[in-house]
Amino acid sequence: MMSGRTDEELKGVTLLGNQSVKYQYQYNPDILESFGNKHPENDYFVKLNFPEFTSLCPKTGQPDFAAIYISYVPDKLLVESKSLKLYLFSFRNQGDFHEDCINIIMKDLIRLMDPKYIEVWGKFTPRGGISIDPYCNHGKKGTKWETMAEKRIQWHDMNPENINNR
């Protein structure tokens, strides 16, 4: 098979192509895997969309559903997408508020990859007639990405979308 990556470069990628992987429904950040960025000199965004996120309300135990949007500018590492999918599924029985889930996801990805810039946005379906859409971001300290994060949070959602009850 043709590959632009060597076996050495792929040795940390263990979940992709592994058909015997079991889904975990308890929060587990150790599922996350990364691989090397072949283009660290380039600034580029990677956007990952996960429309089937579920977690539990920490008070009532009722399920919460959301679409999660992750955008990041990689530095030396990228997140492997199957591990990200399994990681996000691991929130299934996690009791946390929407805002907590989004911040936990961002912090876990920062620990994994140390990206130049990252933002995570959750668009949760309404409960009690209110939809909650938390957003968080982070730019690497002492770089232009720190400034970008400050600007993005200041200007976040200045042109809100029409809400149609999703």
UniProtKB/Swiss-Prot annotation:
Record: residues binding substrate: 79-81, 98-99
One Gene Ontology term from the biological process aspect of the record: tRNA modification
Predominant subcellular localization, coarse grouping: cytoplasm
Gene3D superfamilies, per database record: 3.30.1130.10
Active site: 57, 64
InterPro entries cross-referenced by the UniProt entry: GTP-CH-I_C/QueF, NADPH_dep_7-cyano-7-deazaG_red, QueF, QueF_type1
Record's GO cellular component terms: cytoplasm
Subcellular location: Cytoplasm
GO molecular function terms listed in the Swiss-Prot or TrEMBL record: preQ1 synthase activity
A Pfam family it matches: QueF
EC number, as in UniProt: 1.7.1.13
Pathway note: tRNA modification; tRNA-queuosine biosynthesis
Biological role: Catalyzes the NADPH-dependent reduction of 7-cyano-7-deazaguanine (preQ0) to 7-aminomethyl-7-deazaguanine (preQ1).
Family assignment from sequence similarity: Belongs to the GTP cyclohydrolase I family. QueF type 1 subfamily.
Protein name: NADPH-dependent 7-cyano-7-deazaguanine reductase
UniProt organism field: Alkaliphilus metalliredigens (strain QYMF)
Lineage: Bacteria, Bacillati, Bacillota, Clostridia, Peptostreptococcales
Gene name per UniProt: queF
